[in-house]
Amino acid sequence: MSGFSSEERAAPFTLEYRVFLKNEKGQYISPFHDIPIYADKEVFHMVVEVPRWSNAKMEIATKDPLNPIKQDVKKGKLRYVANLFPYKGYIWNYGAIPQTWEDPGHNDKHTGCCGDNDPIDVCEIGSKVCARGEIIRVKVLGILAMIDEGETDWKVIAINVEDPDAANYNDINDVKRLKPGYLEATVDWFRRYKVPDGKPENEFAFNAEFKDKNFAIDIIESTHDYWRALVTKKTDGKGISCMNTTVSESPFQCDPDAAKAIVDALPPPCESACTIPTDVDKWFHHQKN
């Protein structure tokens, strides 16, 4: 058990919906800033934003106080990823590693592009379908260097340490051996998932090859350094909310009562979710280039 819990506000699949995180004392925290990057030696925390097979594009709201999880919005409409044949929604549990930040002011030497201004993304490949807002502990196995509309957008490949097969996975080659086709599907998914929305295919550094565990950890630790500069005001976040309750060296630290006041001002939890539009289930067929 991680000791963290989540609390929903308003109804899922609405513009007002939020998922706030709490610590073991039941106090509200930021999943971006207050959950430690490391859970143990070489074990990272992961904030689950999108459960496997689902379509609603949920993400940590980097500009909102306490950074709750909310559904992404484009042109006033809630975003859902398309089902690009043969896939259904996201093909892994998708989320982020806390206390990391891909700095948009830093030009990555591997990709030649600046960061995407978000925590680093994680694709968790275990057998369990996780819950939105769940905090899990993961082993990092490798990383993919995606370039999304000119921005560096690293994709970490990891597995839940609680997975029954976790002991068999220690590096990216284990994924190739034990889950044949999964990494190829991952590249294909990321390359084409925006095409149904009229966007071009995404590009990749390293000819779309996955780098190994050690390379991945180096990248994650560099994004942790960028995060620390952000939260200690050594870097201008330009609109990012760095409000936190635990980072003692941060000028943005607040007390638990101030955090509670943020949540108390929002709509209460809702018993039922709104209906997902039926066209979200549509299957798109697109010729691979």
Curated annotation (Swiss-Prot):
Q: Which residues carry this modification: Phosphoserine?
A: 250
The reaction(s) this protein catalyses: diphosphate + H2O = 2 phosphate + H(+)
The organism is Bos taurus
Q: Which Pfam families match?
A: Pyrophosphatase
Lineage of the organism? Eukaryota, Metazoa, Chordata, Craniata, Vertebrata
Q: What is this protein called?
A: Inorganic pyrophosphatase
What gene name is listed for this protein?
A: PPA1
Any idea which UniProt keywords this protein has? Acetylation, Cytoplasm, Hydrolase, Magnesium, Metal-binding, Phosphoprotein
tRNA-binding among keywords: no
Q: Which cofactor does it need?
A: Mg(2+)
Q: Where is this chain's protein located in or outside the cell?
A: Cytoplasm
**Tissues and organs where the protein is expressed, per its UniProt entry:** Highest levels are found in retinal rod outer segments.
